[in-house]
Amino acid sequence: MKKLNIFLASAMAVLSLASCDINDVQNVGELSSSTFPVSKEDGEAVLAGVYQNLNQVCADPQMSFLYYAQLASDDMLGGGGVNDKLMQADDLLCNYNADMTNVFYEARYKGINRANTLIEALPNTSMNEDTKNSLMGQAKFLRAFYYYELASMYGNVPMRLKPGSEAITQGNIEDPWKQILMDLRDAVDLLPAAKSTDGHIDKYAAEALLGRAWLFYSGFFGNGSTLADLTSTTYNPLTSVELPDGTTLSKENVITAIDDCVANSGRKLVDKYQNLWAYTNRCTVEDYDYTKGQGFKWVEDDASQNPETLFSIKFNKYADWGTTIGYANNYALHFGVRGGQAYGNTFPFGQGWGAGPVAPNLVKDWAAAEPNDARRDASIQDWSKVATYKKGGWSDFVQETDYYAKKWAPVTCKNDQLKDGYSCTFENVMYPGNWDVAGKENMQLNNIHDLVLIRFADVLLMQSELKKDVAGINEVRKRAGLNPIAAYSEEALRNERRWELACEGTRWNDLRRWHIAAAALEKQNGVAIYYCGQPDTNTPHNGGYTARYNATAGFQKMPETQVALGTVKQNEGWTGADSEYQGWK
């Protein structure tokens, strides 16, 4: 269980230092600006506070960019109950209440301020250069990632690059992306050429995120930065970018980084696609009809390290209702099966709030393009084939479909020691004991499997896209049991990304950077859904998907609290009544 506890221990170390509250950004900044950090241990403790921001956002996942990216894409609808208007608003590119995502906005800036604290303090310490470089590289990666999410979510976000609490205002909408790319370039240069084995960021994770950020920025802003440019249907990606320090980052530089990641990261594709997902864990696999008897084995069984993971969020058994809710995987909870029905009805998928029903258009498109692709059944549960499944949730389920995303789901297992014969999560059986904080059999706090944000298959597909060759695509297809393709095409690459990475949070920014979002979203109109358990149709709201995308370019509403402070202007498309979601019916 060492892997599961490492970040908690480090975060607790931060909390104990000088009685500093890790949630108080100003105190962290003041402490470090004079004499802290001094030792390697001090620096690692501050860095743990930067990492802890990953889990802080997991406490309220429904307000995060990752959650929005799932529901806003053409692969998922909103879901949730009639009172969960935020979920439906995310899908419809609408808003619900004044500060729908303000918790996320403020949390990410806290993480950025912690990173800034460490970045500013490190040059003045007496640590050896290798230690400084490692800490600096990780801090720059995390700052870049936090800005990546903010800039993807809101567009023109203020840039804070030094610790402090004074008000900062917006610059140019492209400025955040240039800083993101520069931070990631620096992280690649600073981090040692060695694979991390303890869950920390390494050089290769930085190369992978550099590829992702480059592909988004160069594609999305390829036509310019006005609303018309960003919503244009012309795909004309940039080939070079001038960075804030006056240097230039080219497409060839990014290819070099991705090639290095592929060749030297020590990552590899897992032999069987199903083994990536928690439903093949040893406590569940032989009781699930889809997986039993096939030799599947989850790569994270008993806290093992996933050889395909480059960047993930870790969780542990110390989640509680106070400040540590985010130590549990609350994305799993939110994407769990709605309705509180018996675990046997939905086995092996556990309970939750019903976010992100899979859009029928994804299943239809996939079956038409690749009828023999085993990844489809590995990724999506068809409830129409499960006689025990009961539709409607708590008689309130909105935008329910026949399809359920398996990848991020809570997973149960059989347990003869319990009255109903099932543990609410397999983790209760795999990791017995020491559930002293959350308590055992707590369906809201016992999901602790990793949330993988970047995996090696994504890097292979980025390599193919950047180099316009089929090598990476065909390696991914080979694992899926599919025939190789003979020649590279944008259509083949885009399809392969959609199938391989379905329901993993990457599709939304792919649609935006390829300038195909409006057309793709429109396919969700008219698909079959259920409303409170009764057959219904997914109908346009607030003008429809195309109108809302073209009005906003996919950026969310700036929280009104931030607008009132005078630090940001409201984004286009969010000032009229047509942006406010009033409910499904």
Predicted features and spans:
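An aromatic- and glycine-enriched ligand-binding surface/loop that stacks and positions planar moieties
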Residues: D21-K85, H200, Y204, R212-T401
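Residues that flank catalytic or metal-binding motifs in active/ligand-binding sites
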Residues: G155, D202, E207-L209, Q305-P307, ...
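Long, intrinsically disordered, low-complexity segments
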Residues: A18-I22, R108-Y109, N236-L249, W277-V337, ...
